[in-house]
Amino acid sequence: MALSSRAHAFSVEALMGRPSKRKAQDPREEMQPELQEEQFVEEGEEILRSPSRDSQQPEKRLKAESSKTVFSCSDESNSQESLQEESVIQVELQGSDLWKRFHDIGTEMIITKAGRRMFPSVRIKVKGMDPVKQYYVILDVVPVDSKRYRYVYHSSQWMVAGNTDHSCITPRFYVHPDSPCSGENWMRQIISFDRVKLTNNEMDDKGHIILQSMHKYNPRVHVVEQDSRIDLSLIESFPTEGVKTFSFKETEFTTVTAYQNQQITKLKIDRNPFAKGFRDPGRNRGVLDGFLETYPWMPSFSMDFKTFVTDTQSGSSGSSPVTSSGGAPSPLNSLLSPSCSPPMVYIPPSSFGMTYPDAYLHSVNIPFCYRICPTNNWRSQPFVLPTPERLPSFIIPQTLPPLMMEVPVVSSRGIINPNSGLHEDCNGQCLQASHSANQMLYGLQNPGNIFHPNAIAQEAISYPFHPPNGCYRYTISMPPRLENVASHLSENGTSQISFTEGSCDHSHWYPAINHYL
């Protein structure tokens, strides 16, 4: 039976054969007639398929729109977060390296009844404040836990010793004295809490922070916006709004009444500028003595002398009284040794210009005694005066110890010839002294004068010293004619010599005089 053209178009043969023929021609055109045939032949399927496609498209549109809104919201949130980060207040701990060194060992803070300052002190740098707003910067110290600790020496560490109750102590906070201040001023400076004091006196009325000994605490920093309705100086607690709190792990410490860890003690002495006295070598005599023995000194100084006369009875071994111009006994009477035959020189430290600092010898209390007597002429006897407190006639500074020296009673400017009775280079009255009977004690005073033993006439004798020096030793040269005269006098059994006004010229002195400490 023949089919009409319209019926043949919708026949199975046409449907199966026509796509195969057109497959080679145009694959893109294949779907369009197929879809049309499906739409016309299967109406039920077309009705079912069309709503599903329509439903898929709105879903895709909704997803695209939702994704756009998500991206826009995320962009807005990121921008808000960036703005918040710029406006968020940040606090940076200053001196964190030093705090970490203490924290690694175990920081300890001394607390006393009167109050003790912290070292290291809390110092911070603030960022992110509103330059126009007013802020309070406050410090308080809170317990780390509710434990009480004890220090174990054999293991050098802190151990828990029991529980404790901190509710019995009213918490206190320290308001920085610059508060309130604008954010611009706070951000421009380093905020230091070096005036904070810690105390264990629960009845303290000076505003110190009250803590308990052998407990662990951690300081906190609070940045509070100023509120005209609240006066922080009159309240005992923080407001609930507008407060930013900061704390640092390395600032934790244990309260003690005396340092337990020796490493903490050494570190605080080394780094604390107020512990200078503990670093002073004068506190350790052994360290100072070792330093003095090894440190080379090359000082050059000049000396002026002032004379005192001692009268000794020939052949007697008693004490040698010291007399003044009026014949009254001198206050040095009880200080002289019975057999002090050579003259001596007392040198206060202020009279010669040492080049080394006074601090090196300020704690040495032993006076120095130097004998500068020629051993081939006179027998040298030790003679040491006590500390300056027993010499009221001398004004002696306390920075350096006294110095005693023995010198021969000779002069290069005036010497009496015992045979002729004449003297050489002598102008004016002369000082005469006997080797066996008289001794002369020279006390160095301000540049000026020495007393004549008989008439108490004032003379000035200057002894410039330019020797090769060492610690505790001095080499002093002497004119050759003085040695010749001294030896000549000793051979003839007389020692009448004179001093006149003038000074000794050291440029022609070459033999050395023995000296000892």
UniProtKB/Swiss-Prot annotation:
- Name one molecular function that GO assigns to this entry: RNA polymerase II cis-regulatory region sequence-specific DNA binding
The alphabetized UniProt keywords are: DNA-binding, Nucleus, Transcription, Transcription regulation
- InterPro entries documented for this protein: p53-like_TF_DNA-bd_sf, T-box_DNA-bd, T-box_sf, TF_T-box, TF_T-box_CS
Q: Which Pfam families match?
A: T-box
List the biased-composition ranges (Low complexity).
74-83, 314-333
Example GO CC term: the record gives: nucleus
Tell me the superkingdom of the source: Eukaryota
Give the record's GO biological process terms: positive regulation of DNA-templated transcription
Q: Which residues lie within the region annotated Disordered?
A: 1-83, 312-333
Q: Where is the composition biased (Basic and acidic residues)?
A: 46-66
**What broad class describes the main subcellular location of this protein?**
nucleus
Composition bias type Acidic residues, residue spans: 35-45
Q: Where in the cell is it found?
A: Nucleus
**What name does the UniProt record give this protein?**
T-box transcription factor TBX22
Species of origin:
Mus musculus
Give the source lineage, highest ranks first.
Eukaryota, Metazoa, Chordata, Craniata, Vertebrata
